[in-house]
Amino acid sequence: MLEQALITHCAPTLARLKPGGMFALAGVDGAAMEREMRSLNRLLLPKGVVLTVLRRCGQSTLFYLYRPCELRAILESEAARAFLRRCGYADFAPEAALRVLRARLGEGEGFPHEIGIFLGYPLADVIGFIRNGGRNCLLCGHWKVYSDAVGAARKFARYRKCKEVYARLFQSGCPLSRLTVGAKPA
């Protein structure tokens, strides 16, 4: 079940086009899901990818698939740090930042807007979304774009193509291990 969801919702992260992806599943058996997550992480970790839970709410579970090295690079950006400090973050190691994000997700029904940083959205678009209350965007795709519409449109097209190719390959029997691109060499 989780493998199919990863292909459907996180193909660009598996393909190393995005630092992170997120999806929710409802009605998931907790113990079975934990076993499947452990099994998937044994497969994904050597390739520099981690699957974790951000929030459980009733029968729904919010998952986050990410590349820690790429998230670390984003969190090392001084602009991202300044923004996240204003949101209550003090430690910018990926796991520490994820702990704060999990806590903020647990505070209410909605998503804290900084979640876009963890998904690889441009900081200018995250800030634009907040300033405009989600209105007046230049382009709407994987996220609402407020800065570079041309560059974002190119990314959206790459993500769309990636999802199509990954879905086709997975349906034809290609295993997740082959569809997960390894981490960049250090």
Positions of predicted regions on the chain:
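Short linear loop/turn motifs
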Residues: 58-59, 97-101, 130-133, 140-147
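A structured, charge-rich N-terminal accessory region that forms the first stable segment of a protein
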Residues: 1-57
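Generic secondary-structure signature for well-ordered alpha-helical cores
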Residues: 45, 131, 135, 164-168
